[in-house]
């Protein structure tokens, strides 16, 4: 990043201008269909499940077909677990798909097929934590609640606190920081999604594009971009991990019309047989794979 001299000493704002941020968002936001008007609370909840630890570009390849196929909780609940796992494809973390299916079943059965709008009820649903509950309350039901992801924490750390990164999460502190920034109720949802977009596309972790930032004041810029004083960031490994092996084994089962033999599964990962065995046992324990009475393997519900 080019060095920019600190600005003259001023009393720094402890807010972010919603006018500037919302105007920038209208000009520059990505075309993400789950943010469009008319998207149902259920379809927003589906997007939040998919976006957990997954880039939006990968979700774009799955979400539109998913919500056309299963537009409501009841439609999703009637699908088989195997169909849900197949449709989830290579989004990763397939337990999310299973939990989404369970969540749909609970909403259809206990909530008259309507996604609850109360955060305290939302967090009782399978697979729904505090962040997802708040995202649904904000984006589906337009409530003025803080929605704090990694991108939001980074923007607040830099613009408000003058730090290169946010450090370790603290839910009470992070929620209080964002709640203090939220404008009045009518524009709070747009402000929240714009803050996320700013962190995802401009105020990024490794290569922030400060020249494109719409904020007219940033404490980090004002301080001369001090580097992080925390430990070096580590990239999240995938190659060679148990996650990769689990994915390879599930790929075999998703492609199979009938249960497969152990030998057919074994060829999916020949590098480390102990790791392969461990990955298979974990899939069985998570009920993402079933073993038939004759010792073959299948997706849940297909072990005939």
From Swiss-Prot:
User: Positions of the site: Transition state stabilizer?
Assistant: 149
Entry keywords, A to Z: 4Fe-4S, DNA damage, DNA repair, Glycosidase, Hydrolase, Iron, Iron-sulfur, Metal-binding
Name the InterPro entries for this protein: DNA_glycosylase, Endonuclease3_FeS-loop_motif, HhH-GPD_domain, HhH_base_excis_C, HhH_motif, MIG/MutY
Any one GO molecular-function label of the UniProt entry = adenine/guanine mispair binding
- GO BP: base-excision repair; mismatch repair
Q: Which residues form the active site?
A: 48
Q: What is this protein called?
A: Adenine DNA glycosylase
Please name the source species: Mycobacterium tuberculosis (strain ATCC 25618 / H37Rv)
